[in-house]
């Protein structure tokens, strides 16, 4: 019998580390396998193993709309109010041949229900409807909470987890056969949902994310990042739902198939929505065309299919015929070590040699400025160290905040959260405290590295359960109870023991980085050779990747970068994959870029040429002391840092890098000899415009956009506080609202924040807003621009009604619309003046409307 993970003490106090709770239960953290699952029958088992197909049902919202559901009705309440309507729709899907019927619980979390019903009652009623319809398998449906997680919003990871766990327990009690987590755009949110499923049930977990036209989720996650992360944290089947039509999703699914061995599923929309002559929302892909596109995905290796918005029982019936005539083919994928943030993958293939630089600067050892920042809780300084290392060429950031006098569990959570909001790089969580390690990796959006485990049995007993449960990578140090051995063979023996112990937890060598531990040449000169030999042995015999803290080799010697760079080159020759080093060291990075050419990692030498075009040999200009000194500077600014591109504006750099900690003081300093509007128009607004360009180019994603907007807000607030009332011009008044019947307001909230930070006065009417309330605000406040948001296809009717009312009563008002179900064409059909694909586009439209 499965025992749910206890995450709170009897008095309700949350436990700092869930692994402690697992141990209280007598549970063991390990990599979950199919044998750990409660699977209803062999057909479902075959689908989870990837040897059989499975057919989910299609759209529910559009079917409810066709059945006459009123605009603004909460679909989950229909399980009580009109259960026969739900059952009739689901019976049509059963008769069409669907294996899985999705319970009508998509929005059945406590946040969305908001007291309208209990989570347990909704799940019980919804599952009863699906059983009444004759479902072979009933899936408990878990959708987004409807609130942004930190650092973009106010909802914590733990609060999200608790909301999902309540749904999971309700689903188990109601008798679901599996869980489907769907329509997620935030990697942290879907991770919380998967963990809630795993830790509160032993049922199979299917998990899908929704992608925009640019191939990324709303928050910038790619299909590869999604698949790697969902695989790592224990989803049994993973994939894509909603988003676009099946033809558009085929390429995204194919990208997932290259990075995971788990079964991949797709539930596409029936194309794009539009309004027919009768005012109904309809979709443009009919059943035969839908099946033709899905057939291509099945040929690629997708084994679980179904439908989303606009699909009907007719669409599913043709898919039934399709999969009945096909057997999944075995998939063969080359293993690799993958480390991810929410937006970036660093991939180290097992059959090749690729270099990933791990930045070492976020470590308080020997760094008084960082030590003081940690004592003061100055995480802005920590973030600045991460940003500078990203700009200097690091691929991964090591994060160590260990000081004896601070609360490491608390600080490492905050540091990783803020770093993920400001940089794109994956993180390596570096701590000797298992509670701190778990606090960080549990809440981390992506697949990180844990630094580290070693050959001591106690350490392996503490760390490997975390690596297994959270699906992370891990660094293994070649030391044990006897210390660091002198010989290569003894170091290898410890590494071999670490790899063998990891295997007991289901952790393969493709998730292990062995660090043979660099000793300083000043006192252990003969050790350099042993270190390199040990690394070669590990690579040849264990199939692992190798890391080294290369800076240690030169400690206590002059010209440290010179000696260190030569050792780094030798280590690359011995098979080093991940040097842990200072990317601000020019000599070290010169060695990295040069080796990437020689190892053919940098094909065509494009990266090398881009970096060194116009390079001057420092040895040839040694006769000129000033030039020689400049050429040999070891930590010249990297491209993108303040001063490197000729732009020394500190406001620009703080806004672009999303650093809000020091911007208030800098703004106050500049106000001493700058006009307030000059500061806004010539410093803040150009910086925000630059961020918008980076966002459009795909170099920034929503977390970075919002971090920059928050930094600008701090600066604007400082100006408003210090300047006399009326001195700062009002750029214009804007009203934003989520339309009647729709309770999803994440996108609207992001637009509001960005427009606020551009200097507009924004009136936020909230969610589920009646058209008359929007009209009243527009008239009373003399609003010139209105932003309307809708996520659900069933609420676009309310959006159209609001637009017609505004244009009739206030002809001069302009209206922007946005939301997952909208397209430029659809927006035009319902009468909107503008369509905004994202928050940055909303800011550009506002500038056009107000002539700024």
Give the location of each predicted region:
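Domain-level signal for soluble alpha/beta catalytic cores
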Residues: 1-513, 519-852
